[in-house]
Structure formats: C-alpha cells, structure tokens
Amino acid sequence: MSSLLEQLIEAFRVLPGVGQKSAQRMAYHVLEREREGGRRLATTLANAVEKVGHCVQCRDFTESEICTICASSSRDRQQLCVVESPADRLAIEHATGYRGLYFVLQGRLSPLDGIGPRELGLDRLGERLAAGEVTEMIIATNATVEGEATAHYLAQLARQHAVRPSRLAQGMPLGGELEYVDRGTLSHAFGTRSEVL
C-alpha cells in the first residue's frame, strides 16, 4: 500500500466513530469514484480549520469575532442556555422556540481527563454572569455522570451571581411507552414528576 494512501486512511480515522475499515472504505471511495468531491472536501476542510474559530462571547463556532446569535439584537439577553457542544446548541435552536443566548462549554467537567473549569471557559462564563444582564441560566448538559457534575457546578456558579439556575427536564421521551423505557430513566422521571396544571 502506498504511503499516501496509508496517510489518507489514518487521516479519516480522526473522525469520531471511524475505525480502520470505515476509514479504508472512505479513502478508496474518494480515490476510485469521488476525486472531485475529495478535492472539494480537502479545500473546504483546510478553509474551515484555518478560518473557523470561537465566538468571544459564547465560545460557539464562528468565522467572525462574535457569532450571529450573540450579535443579534432580537435575542433575549436575560436568558443564557449553557450547552456542552455546538451540536447541542444547534439541536436546541432547531427543535425549540428558544430566543435567548448560549454559552458553549466545548466539553464537560472530567477531572480524570484533565478537563476542569478553566478548560470549559467557566471563568469567562462567571464574568458574563457578573455583568448582571443574565437573570436565568438554563443548564442543558447531558444526563451523564460528567454532565450532572457539570450541571451542579454551573448551578452553584449561577447562584453566586444571583442568577436563577434551571435544568432541562429529563425522563420519559415523547411518544415513549413505559414498558420500553430503561429502569434508570423511568426512576428519574418518576422521582422528578411535576404537578399537572
């Protein structure tokens, strides 16, 4: 196998969920059938790596200093939704009518992996809360051990700045049937049930 082909296969392996076989299939596909697509991919990837950075206010991906959401005058500046990743921000933006601002952690607290408050930009988040414009922090971290630890830390940070923390509801999926829901989810949903209004 040629050295360039091996390098291409290894390059594809940096993508999440792509193992040796998938990377090999992708490399062969690009070289056998999609050379023009491969050139376009290479050019676009190089441009994105060079030009896409982080918004100075929310840490989401952007090509400018401030992203379009933070720059928008139509957003509610009193609400701040904290998410783990740009993909989480996009999911909320597409699935809800949320009109507030965001703060993207780019991860979650994980001391064993060397990810602490500094790596998540929580000093910048603290400064933003201290400015006094935000009145509610919506904590939208994942329901994992690290996500829950991060949510707890965020709630404490919000309270230190007299900001009301709230957490996304968790539990039964819409349209889900009880018999198919796992025990942990069902237990959590039952324990955090709310009054029907």
Curated annotation (Swiss-Prot):
Which SUPFAM superfamilies is this protein grouped with?
Recombination protein RecR
The family database entries (SMART domains) matched by this protein are listed as: TOPRIM (SM00493)
Start-end of C4-type zinc fingers: 55-70
Q: Pfam families, per this entry? A: RecR_C, RecR_HhH, RecR_ZnF, Toprim_4
Please report the stretch or stretches of sequence annotated as the Toprim domain.
78-173
List, alphabetically, the CDD domains matched.
TOPRIM_recR
Keywords linked to the UniProt accession? DNA damage, DNA recombination, DNA repair, Metal-binding, Zinc, Zinc-finger
Instruction: Give any single GO term for biological process.
Output: DNA repair
- Highest rank taxon of the organism: Bacteria
The UniProt entry, under InterPro entries, shows: DNA_Rcmb_RecR, Rcmb_RecR, Rcmb_RecR_Znf, TOPRIM_dom, TOPRIM_RecR
Q: What does this protein do?
A: May play a role in DNA repair. It seems to be involved in an RecBC-independent recombinational process of DNA repair. It may act with RecF and RecO.
Q: Which family does it belong to?
A: Belongs to the RecR family.
Q: What's the name of the protein?
A: Recombination protein RecR
Tell me the organism. Answer: Xanthomonas oryzae pv. oryzae (strain KACC10331 / KXO85)
Name of the encoding gene = recR
